[in-house]
Amino acid sequence: MQNSTLYLQRLRQLLQMEYDSEKEDFRVQSEKMGIKRKIHRGICWYPVEAGRSYYNSLNQFVVEVVKKDHEEDEEDIEHLFEYGKPVQFFQTRAPYGEDTLAGGFPTGDAPKKDGFSYFSFSSTVSYVDGDRMVVTLPSSQALIDLQNATNLGLQLYFDETSYKTMFHALDDAINAKNNRLADLKDIFAGQLKPEKRTFTPIAFPWLNKTQEQAVNEVLWAKDVEVVHGPPGTGKTTTLVEAIYETLHRETQVLVCAQSNMAVDWISEKLVDHGVPVLRIGNPSRVNDKMLSFTYERKFESHPDYPELWSIRKTIRQIKENRKRGDNVHQKIARLRDRASEIEMAINAQLFDEARVVACTLVGSANKLLVRHKFSTLFIDEAAQALEPACWIAIRRASRVILAGDHQQLPPTIKCYEAMKQGLGKTLMERIVENQPDAVTLLKVQYRMNDDIMKFSSDWFYQGEVESDESVKHRSVLDLEHSIQWIDGKELTHPSPSLQGGGEISANEQTNEQGNCSLPIGRAGSGSSEFDFTEQFIGENHGRINKAEAELVLSTLKNYIDKIGKERFLAERLDVGIISPYKVQTQYLRQQIRKREEFRPFRQVISVNTVDGFQGQERDIILISLVRSNDNGQIGFLSDLRRMNVAMTRARMKLIIFGDKATLQHHAFYRKLIQYVERLKGE
């Protein structure tokens, strides 16, 4: 049994290691990385233009920043800018492409290094929509500086605030004694047993038995409950029902998640269920539906807001126009008192009307929530959240409900040593270990063909997850196997046409599975030999396997041909191509965009990393594992949770591309290869 305080003290040390490591990485990155690499990493916009400015409903001075002309190879880059992220503006001595530009770490007043000049102020992202970003500014002078700048850009800044908030939350939990926070700390550590209410179970005919059990367990729990939702088991449906039922007993609940996207998803489902939601912070997807329940939109839609806006404007005008010796302090003070009075009244009404307050875990430290306490906190996607972030929200609640799957994507951690020593262990995992009676596993999945699901169920969930009859035998083509493994190195007689970009016919070279014949496409590598060995790309040793990528593309094209173009488009079958390696996904995405044979299907083909597909599903999934070497090195493919996510995105067809000789050194991949071979022989 763990001592709860000692555990959290150790956790704080690990968080400090992560903080130090990430801050140093940011410093090195800023000093040594050129603009193009920053852009391709998704951490920089350049060039940009400062557009219109205004005061938003929170009385923050903001400016719209628009991304100007960018190169073709930048079109598919997924940027990392989102609400709440700190950013720093810079200008360059010469336009992009005319100088070799390295960075300069922004400290103090506009340091200059190798053509970079950083502005001395930092800003925060308010929201992002396509090529337009709205960021806060400290003053109108900052705007003038930006408008006068040439070759303007901005990049992500080190996120000091989030770390400070997590440290503060951990300190509160560590020092908690003889209060509710102290009780929860001891319960999570297994030092106290969680209590339950007793009342007759409620029937939910529209849920399955384990979903119904999970909702009842949430209602019975006095302290903590975990809803463990494997892929396709309806975790979100169950969680929404649990929140809805809880609101029959409580006035208001707090709903949090690690990411803005996850908060958006659960918020949207609750709104669809008729629940009044107040979203603190701006959504990751900017549309009218998502914005309609944000605090900022509701605030500025309030009938008293025009008066508040007018008072704020008057105060600014008085300050700007006053002359030396003018005594306007009393007038400004009276106006500020009236503005505060209106603002507090609007706040009170917005919170009174909301049944659910939704925000990220870090966002729960927002000053709007300072005086608010909640009977129940729901944390969605809890297995992706660092435990220190969870404590930020836990401080505001009397009981905690966590939902997620610790066999899927883990939290993102930069410091390997901190991860190895335990920072990667989530609060959800701790509770599952220390309080197994407070965990309900959802056991029926509604997504995958049974053959796709079964290996995942056996390896990750002790065989407890089963397929609903409605999906058990779903398939794209009759009499085909739903799961397939293709190894390019087993294709021993590549045609000379591979070197020139041609294709060989199915008769010349095929990989057979049942009656599904898959031709091998062009390698496009320009090498003298058709080589499926992985290659290193870039300063971070990103990995790419172009021959395997070409095999993926030709396999997909052949499979679409077997289905038939008319049927494929009429039924809107969708395809996901997944690779754990970002460079591989970029190459695949570029090829699909360039090649005419994919033009009719581009709208239904998605290419992304495993992280980019979390929570999604497709009819057809192709996975490119990339790794192929003589040493059996597989890198982070050994994090099996990522492979679990990748495989379980498929509804009807799963095709895995990988070098068996490299991968079968690992027990998981050896078993998976054997499983696929066994199905092939049936």
Question: What are the roles of these predicted feature ranges?
Answer:
Residues 249-251, 259, 348, 362-493, ...:
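Conserved helicase motor core of SF1/SF2 NTP-dependent helicases
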Residues 94-116, 492-530:
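Intrinsic disorder/low-complexity segments
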Residues 2-10, 75-217, 272, 289-313:
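Pre-ATPase regulatory/linker segments immediately N-terminal to the P-loop/RecA-like helicase/translocase core
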Residues 198-199, 244, 252, 264-371, ...:
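Conserved P-loop NTPase motor core of helicases/translocases
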Residues 1-82:
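A helicase ATPase "motif cassette" and its flanking acidic/Ser/Thr-rich regulatory loops
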Residues 203-223, 238, 359, 544:
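N-terminal pre-P-loop "Q-motif" helix
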Residues 227, 255:
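Hydrophobic anchor at the beta1->P-loop junction of P-loop NTPases
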Residues 236-244:
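Motif I (Walker A/P-loop) of helicase-class P-loop NTPases
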